[in-house]
Amino acid sequence: MMSARRDSAKITPKEPRDKPRGSLQAFPNQPESKVVDKVVVSAAEAVNGIVDGSSLAVGGFGLCGVPSVLIAELHHSGVTDLEAVSNNCGVDDWGLGILLKDRRIRRMVSSYVGENKEFERQFLSGELEVELTPQGTLAEKLRAGGAGIPAFFTATGVGTQIADGGVPWRHAPDGSIAKSSPAKETREMDWHGKKLTFVLEHAITTDFALVRAWKGDRHGNLVFRQSARNFNPLAAMAGRVTIAEVEHLVEPGEIDADAVHLPGIYVQRVLALTPEQAHDKHIEHRTVQPRTNAMNGAAQ
């Protein structure tokens, strides 16, 4: 489990809102509630406190839902020696790939890394330590960290090097394996009337989390859109200080409570994107057909 740092910037609450309405008025000695406005004015303020050696949980899947503005600001700040937890590491010129390219990331915990050639080069040359983790297990490790569950048992990985140990974590410059994963605890349990073996996986918590949301309010309540939801809520739960860049900032109360994907209790800072930033989205592989062919195919 990654240790949570205590050197992050403190967020000071703004002025309290008007007196609460309704039944609370019947209790004159009831203290007024203080609601924190979590909006920051710049990307630099948003990433303030992220220092060399910090651990980060970063949302996104491929290039979808990636907090690209926050990552770019981190790159601009010069911070280095980072430990990043993310499903993948972007591509060579986008997402976490821009940090990786300049050797800002020391260690990655990831599930899929096949789209980044620089990632492969650094891993095989011994410059980067990588803990490959099954995708579903990675998702649950992040969720467990946010839910206060220190560890859990899963059937995923039983009978493989994930459970038995020996997955290469770091190579030596000559290509040999310098560090590999340790063996994990396994246990037999009754499951649907059968004795099955499960492996113990530990939760992940990080110093900071960087996520991207489609909509958010000043209290940090977030709504994600379609595929961009992916690992973002899970990463947000795992971070001690969670920073969200949002495409559309709205006032408190404009998001229906039933529509909230991630409650504001998990979010400490909100950065409103400009329209240009919100529309700057990349894809890995364009697979569309020419319009004429697509129309002919539909007619058939």
Model-derived segments and their meaning:
Residues 2-3, 296:
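Position-driven detector of the extreme protein N-terminus
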